[in-house]
Amino acid sequence: MLFNSYVFIFCFLPIVLAGYALLRRGSNLLWPVGWLVLASLVYYAWWRPEFLLLLLFSITVNFGFGTLIIDGGLSRAQSRAILTIGIVFNLCLLGYFKYAGFFVANVDSILGLQWAVPSIVLPIGISFITFQKIAFLVDAHRGLVRNFTLLNYAFFVTFFPQLIAGPITHHSEIMPQIGPSQRRDLAADIAVGMSIFVVGLFKKVVIADSLAVYADAGYATVKAGHPLDSASAWVTVLSYSFQLYYDFSGYSDMAVGLARMFGFQLPVNFYSPYKSTSIIDFWRRWHITLSRFLRDYLYIPLGGNRHGTLRRYLNLGIVMLLGGLWHGANWTFVIWGGLHGLMLTVNHAWRALPVSRSLAFKTRLADRVAVLVTFTAVTLAWVLFRSETLADAKAMFAYLWPMTADPMGWPSFKGLLRTQFTDLRYALTLTEWFRPRELWPAILPPDYLATATRPMGLLLVGVGIATFAMPNTYQIFGRFKPALGLPEETLGSGILRRLDWRVAIIVAGMFLLAVLRLSHVSPFLYYQF
Amino acid sequence: MIESGYLRALVLSLAAWLSLYLIFTWTIDPYGVSPIRLEFPRINALKPKRTDIDRILKPYEVWRYQPRTIFLGTSRANQSLDPSTLDGTRFAPAYNAAIPGGASMKMHAAYLEQYLRLDHNLRTVIVELFLPHMVGGPTPTWADFIGNTVSLFASANTLWDSLATLAYNAVSGRPIHQIERAGYFYHPNRPDPKTLFERFPSYIWSAAVHQPDRATFDQAAFDGALEIIQIARANNLELIFLIGPSHPYPDYYYDAIGAWGVIEEWLTKLSALATVYSFSQPNGWVDEPISPHMTYWYDTFHYSLAMGRGMLRSLAGAPTSGLPDNFMERLTPDRVASNIERRRAAVRRWAEANPSLVAQFEEARRKWLASEKTSH
């Protein structure tokens, strides 16, 4: 079940919220927490019920490990051994479901063993759930776990707002909230949570999904072996860059908003990453809880920055390579991770140079250039993230390079400028705007995305302005303490001072647009007589 | 601070926005489906967005209008058969439910089943046969019907297309192509047919057509036709298959790839099982000379509304004048061979009279065959 689906918005959420409101009236915490666990299991089982058994099995085994570590009276060494077994168990589950096919395919291609590549369906959210459980076991071993019961643990793992795609939470962040959440003003939490959820839904459904059509068309063209001109290639990669941004930002907002409706605060996971002035800054703003997990449970155990500069860079590289692999079982993700590791290393090396601290690099202009450079680097790296094969990525990089005078190179940008911006006969022909089709033609002309998909240019400019110039959700709702881990200045200076009828009008309008966007009238492009 | 009435304001605002949305989209009505049906010149009379959405729109309109007769077919039937021609005949009211672009026999069968559930007034179904299209295609489901109908009334596209419709009517106001109320496609500004005829060789011998050099009997497609016959019999429907007019140029193509045997096999088998009328006989209308202004042809494959009116009036037995004597012919198994022989002879005559078109065709074919040989 997706957050951006009719069934979730109009059935699941109202029922769960109503049940929760009723059950929390009593004094027994078991009922509301149990209700949320039950709802979360239904939510998880919606896609493929058989994976619920896997989730329950994994919860039971991890609860056993946790009980042994916390209440087993074990020595430090014994506790460490149980922790190791627990981590191996969780990684084996993840490895089997996510990486077995990748591993077999690669061994087979290297050794030519003619192995059959297994086709294993990936249980939804397993990457996040695995990290969450590993984090719990490590915290248990470190003595950081309180209020440890089966119900609480099941709630911590399965709480549906963060079950499928994070944020990856610590036990210590969620457990202390269970008691107080029952005493909070539910109506106020619903008001704040619903408003944040709607903002996230709007970002995901209206912005990200609109851009996805064009990004998908461009990448599909390249995958089919057909050329793109440079302008269309840039339209494709920029569309994807902003699509991914608003997809993840929207999802994170929805998760935070949903949790808040039930009185819980999740950690902040996304904080205007495209406003970063460096790659280091980017990873402090993009998927913050993953970066935190990798830092706390991989980078620091590897030695972090405690063993000299070279070792630090090596550790960074290892962490980012594994971080890349965590995103998907494909060499494109590994190389994407490696590339970010390399960029982080260069960034750290640059910061170590005295010249980087000169006043020339502290100006507003320098900051803006740094934001542009960082955004460009991140956007180009997304080519690897989005391409299905390294060959597709290579082809896309080649199309992005405009240094030729033929129509596929620099001149293609003239066509883009003319049709999208300067020639009003094209740019303002309203009936020809926004025509995402049911099926793209088998072969798109190379300049199709740059010239025919109007007003793609205006859309990208609008989204760019929104991304770089507007405040983020937390800066808007900061005064309502929407998430954990926000900077103090954000909490104190949120743009919205009060939720009143004016905000209600805007939020309701965004909600209606988003819900309407869930349904499509998709024209069919007749490409064959 | 959260005002005490915030949630109530949220609900009321949502109701207000929704009301505005409904008033606006039902008034502008970009897809012509509004329950209130208001039409204002320079505001919403022209519907530029009521196009390319046949698969979404037509099941809904069949359910809404409950026609007695429906047409199934591809873009030929869609562009050229105006159901109002049948007004006053036993077939009325009729609706053109043809789906352009890749419609197959299997798809027609699935749509027919759906239409039988949606339309309790249905008595006759007229199915266009177009031989190159007897391939697979998506089939409709109930979930599609519900999802598509919801999308016509409640989607961001509806809002956007309402704005586009309003802008087009206010700014341009020129007649534009759209699906007419009875389901057929009307294009007021057709391009010069001669140019389109001249493009035929480069189109047919290109990657846009799957295996253009082959013609084999497609059993799955024929099974689709059998399925349509079974559905019609089981539901006591009158079923008529139409062989639409075929210009000598595409007939030359069928001749060149040796397709006559397949066509004969199809028609012989089908005419033994169902009523089949052919409009492909060579005559003054079908063989109209290619020129920039043609009366009976829009392009190589698409015959005109004038031709379509003649077909429907002939079919309904309505009084007609000026039609060629052999315009409509009922095919029976014993008549198929002679019908095809007449077409073949006409093609050869046409080829002799049009050497430049034949040369263009053969040059495109030679290039395609050479490129195929290289790629293999």
Regions flagged by a language model, labelled:
Chain B
Residues 106-112, 218-226, 257-270:
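Well-ordered, non-membrane alpha-helical segments in soluble/globular domains
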Residues 231-255:
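Active-site segments of SGNH/GDSL-like serine hydrolases
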Residues 44-71:
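Short extracytoplasmic
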Residues 261-369:
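C-terminal regions of proteins
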Residues 8-29:
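Hydrophobic membrane-insertion alpha-helices, especially the h-region
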Residues 66-156:
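Membrane-embedded segments
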Residues 28-53:
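Alpha-helical transmembrane signal-anchor/signal-peptide segments
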Residues 124-131, 138-235, 326-376:
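Secreted/periplasmic serine-hydrolase-like ester/acetyl group-modifying domain
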